[in-house]
A protein has these predicted regions:
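RNA pseudouridine synthases
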Residues: 1-165, 280-292, 299
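RNA substrate-recognition surfaces in RNA-acting enzymes
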Residues: 223-265
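Active-site flanking residues adjacent to catalytic metal/cofactor-binding acidic residues
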Residues: 65, 213, 224
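Residue-level recognition of conserved structural "scaffold" positions that shape functional pockets
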Residues: 77, 89, 122, 213, ...
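Compositionally biased, intrinsically disordered low-complexity regions
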Residues: 117, 150, 157, 231-232, ...
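The conserved catalytic core of RNA pseudouridine synthases
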Residues: 99-131, 139, 143, 162-220, ...
């Protein structure tokens, strides 16, 4: 329909000669036009699947789950099964749906991001938690290993984020804040290893790939974040076994080094403050241990 085409253009899903264009773009003879339309709602296609979940907390209104890396949160193009939503439908009945008709979900994590995710079990919880996210009263803390020696002990990144016009699978920072949605990330250094830094991030907003894009924007791409160039080895060291060391780290941690460590919110029923924390997963912990050892090598720096 005309409306769907207009929405696709506004969302950056219409490409002319491999470049995303705006609705008022005028095409010329021999231009190659490609349109990607969103799939219809998945609520009629969803099926329950017996996928194990690490449930940290559960009551009549909500669930806190420690998501493993590699688990997609909800079905989408290329991932119609094997997702967190499929698992939720198996383990929990009659979950409320959000505005996107995704059962129980009030926020999401990227596929390769591990850590805590909050799920609503009741309509009361769905509304309350959604309101808390909207009002920015939910506290979310992440830990990430990033490339480079982050000089400042702490800082704030305030820069709009929107879809990359050249690659719709990526997001991009628009520093003039004229394009995209407002995005604010607070970070602080936890530990420095010379060529990488362990940081903690607190989000004021929850944009797609926010930490990954913001850290790349300030020159500190997440370690092994392939989509944003974090799988490219930082050069400059004279340490003879440096490349071998990094390759070994990549094998241990075949994903971006990002973990949703803490989530805090008010319980929808009694308004009691609840805070949950999860340990770093084994893959990130092993890589950190290796960096602690090798960064002390006399030839490393």
């Amino acid at each position: 329909s005309r409306n769907k085409i207009q929405m696709a253009a506004k969302s950056g899903f219409i490409f002319v000669n491999e470049t995303s264009v705006k609705p008022n773009f005028k095409i010329k003879p021999k231009d190659v036009v490609k349109v990607t339309l969103p799939h219809p709602p998945f609520e009629n296609l969803l099926k329950s699947e017996k996928i194990p979940l690490n449930v940290v907390f559960e009551d009549d209104h909500l669930i806190v789950i420690n998501k493993e890396a590699g688990l997609v949160v909800h079905p989408g193009h290329g991932n119609y099964s094997g997702t967190l939503v499929n698992a939720l439908l198996y383990h929990f009945k009659n979950l409320p749906v959000n505005s996107n008709e995704r059962p129980g979900l009030v926020h999401r994590l990227d596929k390769e991001t591990s850590g805590l995710i909050l799920v609503a079990k009741s309509n009361l919880a769905m509304k309350s938690l959604a309101d808390q996210f909207y009002n920015k009263t939910i506290n979310r803390t992440y830990q990430a290993l990033v490339w480079g020696n982050v000089q400042k002990d702490n800082g704030t990144i305030n820069a709009n984020i929107a879809r990359d016009l050249k690659n719709r699978l990526k997001m991009f920072v628009y520093a003039d804040n004229e394009i995209g949605k407002k995005a604010i990330t607070h970070y602080k250094v936890i530990e420095r290893f010379g060529y990488v830094t362990l940081i903690e991030c607190n989000l004021e907003t929850g944009r797609t790939h926010q930490i990954r894009v913001h850290m790349k924007h300030i020159g500190h791409t997440l370690f092994n974040d392939e989509r944003y160039g974090g799988n490219i080895i930082l050069k400059g060291t004279k340490f003879s076994k440096y490349k071998q060391f990094i390759d070994n780290c990549f094998k241990i941690l075949p994903r971006q080094a990002l973990h949703a460590k803490t989530i805090g919110f008010k319980h929808p029923l009694n308004q009691k403050k609840m805070v949950f924390t999860s340990d770093l997963p084994e893959d990130i912990s092993q890589v950190l241990k290796k960096w602690r050892t090798y960064s002390k090598h006399k030839d490393f720096l």
